[in-house]
């Protein structure tokens, strides 16, 4: 890489930073008022505006289906052969689904739907049981991953057809906004993008950190306190600082690859020692229940019974995925040079879905079997100790748990460290003025944003409970939803006229491509 781009774009650096600082300070100085404010924001956006998330997500899925079957399907991201072999490319897409969040939710999400089901069903009833394992597949399924893929098509077009370097989403809005995308409106778009991604990662870290602390407590006996959570966040920041200033970025990437293999090994082990036949049978049954109820799940707002189920779960999940959509779409596009739109949309969407579905099939059904056989009582454990403790207790029932728990510790630690590192890098790129191809943002800028991400995550943990974590994603992603709409509408309007179709008939042979 050439010398670092060190000049900061003041209009992009300070506004999101000040917003985060004001919010964190207010919460720390008056936690009760902070909690009330968080609850009000969450209630307004999910109760009054929640339908917008659902309509947008379903419409986005329709756009992605259009990309698969419509006139763009055979158009290629650049005239070259694919950069990576098909097997390597699918492997990178598949491994992108491994995260601390999926380790957190996959063993236990069904329980919340079983005890407080949608559609007015009786808790713990057979009908609630069927939906309990189907709903996670919906929340982490095609509609959610399509959010990444839709904008990913646009970024692939910008990167490899138009030859543009896209570090900020405002660049992708030029097709619809014209010169305004380079002015104050463009700055506002980039600021909202930063706020959304900060909120999304804060939710992820806020989930993963207490779980990691509980694993440490189980292994070492060290009490789980806010101080332990803070220590973990500090260690992550130090590791990122060492990687940045010590030139160990390649080491971080290798750790990310190791994390993926570790996750797959853990899945294989639980699949082997757990109720394998039940896992497959219940997973297939859950798929059927999900597809049978897909449109109702997609548009369920519960205005009559007002159970809060779609607000607390469906809208939260959609908002969380939206928060990461632009940055993930950029990543997916960057590794997909030479692919057709159809190849990209199918590969990127279903590789991620298959990965997370594997986690839910194995971990979720393992827990359900434990609960059914009376090995654990989730209701009592969660009431007495909380969700992270319950998840650790689930994994503690595995044979050789004394070996498995340290493996989970390493998996969680690496997963969260790599995601903080990547998001800090993204924020540093966005806030660097006139960054050119081959240049890196300043090292201090990357480390600074890692500290900011850790600080806001700790603030949300300090408030306690799920609501602050959910509210962060819902509030932060609301503007991002409109940015995505601008990007998609502008692309369809412009690319429909300008995209060269001369490469449509070129073969997608990847035998001569490099394997990475």
Outline where the language-model segments fall:
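Flexible loop linkers connecting adjacent transmembrane helices
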Residues: 2-4, 36-42, 69-87, 111-135, ...
């Amino acid at each position: 890489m050439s010398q670092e781009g060190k000049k900061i774009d003041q209009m992009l650096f300070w506004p999101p930073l000040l917003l985060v600082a004001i919010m964190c300070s207010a919460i720390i100085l008056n936690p009760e008022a902070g909690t009330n404010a968080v609850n009000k924001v969450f209630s307004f956006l999910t109760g009054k505006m929640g339908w917008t998330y659902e309509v947008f997500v379903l419409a986005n899925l329709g756009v992605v289906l259009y990309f698969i079957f419509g006139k763009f399907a055979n158009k290629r991201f650049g005239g070259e052969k694919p950069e990576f072999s098909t097997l390597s490319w699918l492997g990178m897409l598949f491994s992108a689904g491994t995260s601390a969040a999926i380790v957190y939710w996959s063993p236990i999400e069904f329980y919340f739907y079983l005890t407080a089901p949608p559609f007015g069903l009786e808790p713990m009833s057979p009908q609630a049981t069927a939906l309990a394992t189907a709903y996670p597949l919906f929340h982490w399924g095609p509609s959610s991953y399509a959010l990444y893929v839709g904008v990913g098509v646009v970024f692939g077009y910008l990167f490899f057809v138009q030859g543009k370097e896209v570090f900020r989403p405002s660049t992708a809005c030029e097709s619809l906004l014209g010169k305004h995308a380079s002015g104050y409106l463009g700055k506002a778009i980039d600021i909202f993008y930063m706020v959304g991604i900060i909120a999304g990662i804060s939710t992820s870290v806020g989930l993963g950190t207490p779980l990691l602390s509980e694993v440490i407590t189980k292994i070492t006996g060290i009490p789980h306190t806010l101080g332990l959570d803070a220590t973990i966040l500090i260690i992550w920041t130090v590791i990122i600082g060492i990687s940045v200033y010590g030139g160990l970025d390649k080491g971080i990437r290798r750790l990310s690859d190791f994390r993926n293999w570790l996750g797959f090994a853990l899945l294989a082990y639980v699949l082997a020692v757990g109720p394998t036949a039940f896992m497959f049978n219940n997973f297939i049954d859950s798929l059927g229940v999900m597809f049978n109820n897909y449109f109702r799940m997609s548009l369920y707002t519960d205005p009559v019974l007002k159970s809060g189920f779609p607000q607390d779960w469906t809208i939260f999940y959609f908002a969380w995925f939206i928060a990461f959509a632009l940055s993930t779409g950029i990543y997916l596009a960057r590794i997909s040079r030479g692919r057709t739109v159809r190849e990209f949309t199918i590969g990127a969407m279903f590789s991620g879905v298959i990965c997370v579905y594997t986690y839910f099939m194995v971990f979720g059904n393992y827990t359900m079997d434990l609960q059914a056989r009376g090995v654990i009582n989730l209701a009592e454990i969660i009431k007495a100790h909380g969700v992270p403790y319950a998840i650790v207790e689930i994994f503690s029932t595995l044979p050789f748990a004394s070996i498995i728990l340290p493996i989970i510790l390493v998996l969680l630690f690496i997963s969260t460290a790599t995601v903080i590192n990547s998001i800090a890098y993204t924020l540093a790129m966005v806030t660097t003025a006139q960054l050119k191809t081959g240049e890196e943002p300043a090292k201090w800028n990357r480390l600074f944003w890692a500290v900011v991400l850790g600080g806001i995550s700790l603030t949300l943990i300090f408030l306690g409970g799920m609501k602050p974590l959910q509210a962060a994603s819902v509030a932060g992603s609301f503007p991002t939803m409109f940015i995505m709409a601008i990007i998609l509408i502008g692309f369809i309007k412009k690319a429909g006229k300008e995209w060269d179709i001369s490469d449509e008939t070129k073969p997608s042979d990847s035998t001569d491509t490099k394997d990475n």
